Each structure stands twice: as C-alpha cells, then as structure tokens.
C-alpha cells in the first residue's frame, strides 16, 4: 500500500469511522465472489439497513447479458428478502481508476427506497460521497403512478 493509499485509508477510518470501514471491508470481501466470466469486472456492495444490519452483494453475470444482476441490486434484493426496506448507506467498490458509479438500473432501485447516502469507492481507497437524489435527479417514483387519477 502506498503512502497516499494509507493516508486515504486513514481518512476512511476517521469518517463515520467504524461503520464506513466495515462497509468497505465487506464490499471488498464479497466482490471476490463475483461471477464474471464474460467481463472480468468484479463489483462488491455493502448496504447498511436502518436496523444496523449489513447486506452484501456482488455482480453475477449471465451469457444473456440482460439477465446479469449488479452488486448493488443484489444487496438490495437480499435485504428486502430478509425484511429490511429502510436504508442508511450503500457502499460500492470496484477495481477502477476512479470510484465506481452505479448503472442506471441500480440508481432506480436505490431511488425506490429513499434518499440515503451512497459511497462510491475503488480498491485504491478513494471515495466519493453523495446521496441518491444526486445520482438520479428527477427519478421515476410512486407519485408518477398517480398522475391523472
């Protein structure tokens, strides 16, 4: 680990300290389980429910690309299947030059569950912090379904 990486890692430890560190470590760990025989692009996600429980997900590719499930959605679907529907923070990590950004489908799934913090990161310990509304402004939501009723 370079000196700069160590400094950034120390910053992660100092920001919301333990929780962010746990999310980062779990996302990096679950990333190794990614099934990516076609792209080789592994992504890990760790999602903190408001209950305090952490749910993880990795991307799972399919030869029929449209059936691929991203790490972020995998974490959300796991959380919902276990009864969690309120979230505080999502952290996503990949081996990219800049912190990895979620795809549009994942952004829409995030927006379904509110405007919580999203932390984009990479294996170089860089992070970008934002909220769901910044990733997907003007999102389609339940209010759109009531138009004209």
Task: Give residue ranges: language-model regions.
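Short acidic-glycine loop/turn motifs at beta-strand connectors
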Residues: 49-51, 123-124
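Compact, glycine-rich, soluble single-domain proteins
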Residues: 59-74
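Short Gly/Pro-enriched turn/cap motifs at secondary-structure boundaries
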Residues: 35-38
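Histidine- and/or cysteine-centered catalytic micro-motif in compact active-site loops
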Residues: 48-50, 59-60
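Short beta-strand scaffold segments in enzyme catalytic cores
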Residues: 40-49
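C-terminal binding/interaction regions
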Residues: 2-33, 82-149
């Amino acid at each position: 680990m370079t000196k700069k990486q160590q400094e950034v890692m120390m910053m992660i430890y100092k920001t919301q300290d333990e929780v962010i560190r746990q999310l980062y470590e779990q996302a990096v760990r679950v990333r190794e389980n990614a099934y990516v025989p076609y792209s080789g692009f592994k992504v890990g996600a760790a999602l903190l429910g408001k209950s305090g429980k952490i749910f993880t997900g990795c991307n799972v590719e399919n030869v029929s690309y449209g059936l691929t499930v991203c790490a972020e959605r995998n974490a959300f679907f796991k959380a919902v299947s276990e009864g969690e529907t309120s979230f505080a923070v999502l952290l996503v990590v990949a081996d990219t030059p800049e912190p990895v950004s979620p795809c549009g489908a994942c952004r829409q799934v995030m927006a379904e569950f509110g405007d919580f913090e999203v932390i984009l990161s990479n294996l170089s310990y860089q992070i970008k912090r934002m909220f769901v509304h910044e990733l997907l402004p003007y999102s389609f939501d339940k209010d759109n379904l009531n138009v004209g009723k």
